Amino acid sequence: MDDHETPLLSKDLSSSSSSSSSSSSVVVSSLKWILKVVMSVIFVTWVVFLMMYPGSLGDQILTNWRAISSNTLFGLTGSMFLIFSGPILVIAILASLYLIISGEETVFTKKKITKFPRFRLWTFPVLVDGPFGVVSAAEFLGIMVFSVFFLWAIYAYTLRNLNVLDYFHVLPNNRSIFLLELTGLRFGMIGLLCMVFLFLPISRGSILLRLIDIPFEHATRYHVWLGHITMTFFSLHGLCYVVGWTIQGQLLELLFEWKATGIAVLPGVISLVAGLLMWVTSLHTVRKNYFELFFYTHQLYIVFVVFLALHVGDYLFSIVAGGIFLFILDRFLRFYQSRRTVDVISAKSLPCGTLELVLSKPPNMRYNALSFIFLQVKELSWLQWHPFSVSSSPLDGNHHVAVLIKVLGGWTAKLRDQLSTLYEAENQDQLISPESYPKITTCVEGPYGHESPYHLAYENLVLVAGGIGITPFFAILSDILHRKRDGKDCLPGKVLVVWAIKNSDELSLLSAIDIPSICHFFSKKLNLEIHIYVTRQSEPCLEDGMVHKVVHPSVKTPWTNGCSMSVLVGTGDNIWSGLYLIISTIGFIAMITLVDIFYINKYNITTWWYKGLLFVVCMVASVLIFGGLVVVFWHRWEHKTGEVEANGNDKVDLNGEETHNPSAAELKGLAIEEDVQNYTTIRYGTRPAFREIFESLNGKWGSVDVGVIVCGPATLQTTVAKEIRSHSIWRSANHPLFHFNSHSFDL
């Protein structure tokens, strides 16, 4: 054989492989584009119909639709469900297919970024202060659209009310009462249209939120806004009827009415009372000072939804059923995931009182650096769940995830005491029996967060933190450094960290990340600056030189049982979560159709509230039966996959971290490796002057896109957003364009 044949053959194979890969990429891109177009068309058409519905044209469209579809297999209720709730379920199914095709990880390269900086609707702050907090241009447009819709709906329904008065020739004495009740009816209808969207933002692992890459912690604010609007219209709905019945002198008689055919009043009263209790306890002051009262009262959503179905019947309840069904899907999956006990690999306490827990996770669990989890510690409470940002990067290790917890309230104080007890028991290990050894039994929901690691989309980053808000930025830095070390695609080359703390003892948080050990000679690969502002001290303490030492060394838990976090989460495996959604939806449609054919129609069931109850039962049963079946197989797949990967070649140390074997050159240079403190500037007795900070970057970074991520209190976010807005409006062509991103969690 000629010596040149092998290289030629290799070149042919390489060319063939490249051609096949290119062809596959074109097919994937085409499918994604088609799905995007189809989903966009369905969504726009659906929203336009919802906005037209209060008017006479929308009413005529619905009448024609019912005439066409009510005689089909789905019946009258099915026709309403298809036009109001069907589109959002179809979009969810298409979204699951889109995510499956897209793959697991978004890779940002220089080819994907624009040559010149440009404004983005989601990252340009328009409103920076007020009841809405920091509002981006995209959110402001959404607020405007909803505001126009409400004004239009009130105007359109008022015209229709006047036409109804003329049509029925109501007597002058009863005209005002009739108009009042008719207005109450319209307010209730607007409330139902708002409720179409109400449950979509609070589905933590929602396929829809993942599609548009809005994490749950951001979406909760939309739920809050929609909740206020929905309850306002429902309250006006109830108030109009109460005033009208009071004028008639029939308030108590009609208030407790529960008709078989038509609207059942008493269930509506119960639903409204439950809604009002949730509304009052969700106000910012109550939620901030009495969070547990807010949390437990909010469980009345079950009463609110069930009695709403009894109040309006299946026909009208089908208007809001789509969003509620997606929420039930998410809630059942969360319940199943949270039943598993998760091992605490290690725990330690820092001088500032912050606790670090390292939790076990399976190798196939995917998450991004800006993710968060909900944590329950059964020794402290069986009911309380608390959200915490993840402080570790997915590249830190395949078998663990770490969180930092600041001791602020009663729950975290109890956790600190439990860790202290555990530390003392470890020192007396020989004297304590296994049965009496203190334990920390944790359960976890999540992780949740952005679908794509958007911090990797910027070549230049400014990370602004307040206090414990530095936690997610440890994950970002670790993620970037791991990628730089391993030669993976990683855009960020310049990172400025601005961290404001009250006292210097919080500097010990820096011990949670050891930058030189992650990436040796990191300064050659990453331009990193850390500016720390200690606001309540005018000069350093004597102990500041020892800030990297911890009070208690890492505690290894002796009672681990090999249980890691469950991957049964909406943000988990795309194929399984897609199957869960699709099969549950098909099961629900099949179940409601069979009940309609073989029970409701066969036995001539006409009671509205009973049909509404059957509708809710079918929703829940379809998730439990069909969704539960998928969950069982998903769990078995997780178990088998976990066993295979557990027998892999991953090297994990006692802290759950994968070992990295440095090269000979790295080992040779360890003695002269730079210290991260050389790139850290600490200022005492002052706060960050963000205008000066941003102006200083004008000459250093030039005309580039700069991602600014803020994690901290509302005042910090407002201050940064205000400076970004001002800088962006008056910037010169050769200055950076700053993009505001918030990473603060506020239930």
UniProtKB/Swiss-Prot annotation:
Gene Ontology MF: a single term: ferric-chelate reductase activity
Name of the protein described by the UniProt record: Ferric reduction oxidase 7, chloroplastic
Chief location category: plastid
Binding residue positions for FAD: H386, P387, F388, S389
Regions crossing the membrane: 37-56, 81-99, 132-155, 222-245, 297-321, 344-364, 574-596, 612-634
Membrane-related topology note: Multi-pass membrane protein
EC class: oxidoreductase
Renumbered residue ranges of the record's region Disordered: 1-23
Cellular component GO terms, alphabetical: chloroplast; chloroplast membrane; plastid
Gene: FRO7
Organism of origin: Arabidopsis thaliana
